[in-house]
């Protein structure tokens, strides 16, 4: 029913565009995404399908900087994936508990430092994990590499002015469970705020951005 409703809504937007010439296709795209977010909002204040502009791992330099199989990165990730949240939460929420522990450790200890003037420097995780400092690029690369080194699926989202990590936390059927896990493990940080997910092919991805205090 939701698909049928969205289909007619899209047809309606195209009809609107033919009547109002100033409405661009990009505007329709944005309206469509906004409609999806509104249509899938639920009482848990979850904003589902957060549209992302940019590409995933298309920058070769980002690929080269990733080190998910490096022994030091693996040791770092294992240690800090168990630093927070008792085993009872692992039994309750599963492997996402480890991902959230990593997020919390890196987020709490990271200090923002700009790149050298006129240069976009990508720090490898083996460097970043010692410094615990750098810009959003370095943070995203360390976060993604750490998640991947403990068996998680992560991707780096590249936009013109920002870079951040998204982590796969299940499928769309797990939406309520993951939302509950985030609110349980980050109660003070979330408070009454929304949790933002991104759906891709039925899979559920959550933002592990430096600018957010919780996933």
Regions found by a protein language model. Name each.
Residues 19-40:
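Ser/Thr/Pro/Gly-rich low-complexity linker/stalk segments immediately outside membranes or between
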Residues 33-50, 66-88, 143, 186-196, ...:
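Pepsin/retropepsin-fold aspartyl endopeptidases
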Residues 55-131:
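Secondary-structure boundary elements
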Residues 138-215:
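Hydrophobic/aromatic-rich core segments of domains that either
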């Amino acid at each position: 029913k939701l698909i049928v409703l969205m289909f007619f809504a899209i047809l309606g937007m195209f009809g609107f565009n033919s009547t109002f010439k100033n409405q661009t296709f990009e505007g329709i795209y944005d309206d469509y995404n906004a409609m999806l977010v509104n249509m899938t909002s639920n009482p848990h204040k979850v904003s589902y399908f957060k549209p992302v502009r940019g590409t995933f791992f298309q920058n070769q330099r980002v690929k080269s900087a990733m080190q998910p199989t490096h022994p030091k990165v693996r040791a770092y990730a294992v240690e800090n994936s168990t630093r927070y949240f008792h085993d009872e939460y692992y039994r309750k929420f599963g492997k996402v508990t480890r991902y959230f522990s990593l997020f919390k450790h890196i987020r709490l200890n990271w200090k923002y430092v700009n790149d050298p003037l006129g240069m976009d420097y990508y720090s490898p995780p083996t460097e970043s994990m010692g410094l615990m400092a750098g810009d959003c690029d370095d943070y995203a690369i360390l976060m993604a590499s750490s998640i991947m080194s403990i068996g998680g699926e992560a991707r780096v989202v590249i936009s013109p002015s920002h870079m951040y990590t998204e982590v796969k936390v299940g499928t769309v059927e797990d939406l309520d469970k993951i939302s509950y896990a985030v609110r349980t493990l980050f109660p003070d940080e979330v408070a009454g705020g929304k949790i933002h997910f991104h759906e891709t092919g039925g899979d559920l991805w959550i933002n592990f951005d430096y600018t957010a205090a919780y996933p």
